[in-house]
């Protein structure tokens, strides 16, 4: 029987800084300061023997590939047990200066081709995708205090969270009256309605993820009734 060549692409979105036995990133999120010439992201190959072809690209908030940033190198080979740095350079597109803008960077790793006992080619690709926040230079230097500004309101079975700050706020361990609900990312200067419906709701607790990827202390806030 003629040997069959096949490629299995398994896209794995990793939130951890290092992917054991393969390729991982040195951060779980990036802050791109507008006054910086560039930002860098460390890429690590923890495999002792395999080399990987690394391909990187940027996406906008809607998940569409964008040329708003230049990535260099966009394609290269990462040898076993080595590290490299990907540079991200903003191209100067006009963006809002009173709030952050959200992008994503995807780093795809394609290993060197191997063959199984039947002679078939095996190739597994993985992709790490993290948020990139473009931060205008005009914003104040107290982003890590943003969680204290979140307010909540309860009306007609729904809870609405408001973020009056210029920063994106990513919540974790979000609870309404002690009941865990799906965490949300709150865009700057906007309101977000939680998916769940509640028969009653009086209080809110949550943590957020700061600029360094760490969890902030638990914040407690009452829910206003409309």
Predicted regions, residues:
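Intrinsically disordered, low-complexity Pro/Gly/Ser/Thr-rich segments with frequent PxxP/GP/PP motifs
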Residues: 66-95, 178-203
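Beta-sheet-dominated interaction scaffolds and their linkers
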Residues: 20-43, 142-151
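Short beta-strand and strand-turn-strand segments in soluble, beta-rich domains
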Residues: 53-55, 59-74, 169-180
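Short, acidic/polar linear motifs in exposed loop/turn regions
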Residues: 46-50, 111, 164-167
């Amino acid at each position: 029987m003629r040997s069959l060549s096949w490629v299995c692409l398994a896209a794995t979105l990793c939130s951890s800084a290092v992917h054991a036995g393969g390729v991982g990133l040195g951060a779980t999120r990036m802050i791109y300061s507008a006054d910086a010439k560039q930002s860098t992201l460390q890429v690590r190959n923890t495999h002792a023997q395999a080399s990987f072809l690394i391909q990187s690209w940027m996406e906008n908030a809607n998940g569409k590939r964008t040329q708003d940033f230049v990535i260099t190198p966009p394609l290269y080979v990462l040898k076993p047990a080595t590290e490299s740095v990907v540079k991200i350079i903003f191209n100067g597109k006009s963006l809002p200066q009173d709030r952050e803008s959200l992008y994503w960077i995807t780093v795809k790793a394609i290993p060197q081709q191997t063959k199984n006992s039947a002679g078939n080619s095996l190739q597994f690709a993985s992709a790490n995708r993290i948020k990139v926040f473009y931060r205008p230079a005009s914003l104040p230097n107290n982003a890590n205090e943003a969680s204290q500004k979140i307010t909540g309101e309860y009306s007609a079975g729904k809870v609405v969270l408001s973020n009056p700050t210029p920063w994106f706020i990513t919540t974790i361990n979000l609870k309404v009256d002690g009941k865990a609900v799906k965490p949300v990312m709150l865009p700057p200067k906007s309101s977000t309605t939680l998916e769940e419906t509640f028969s009653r709701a009086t209080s809110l607790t949550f943590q957020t993820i700061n600029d360094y990827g760490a969890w902030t202390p638990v914040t407690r806030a009452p829910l206003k009734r409309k």
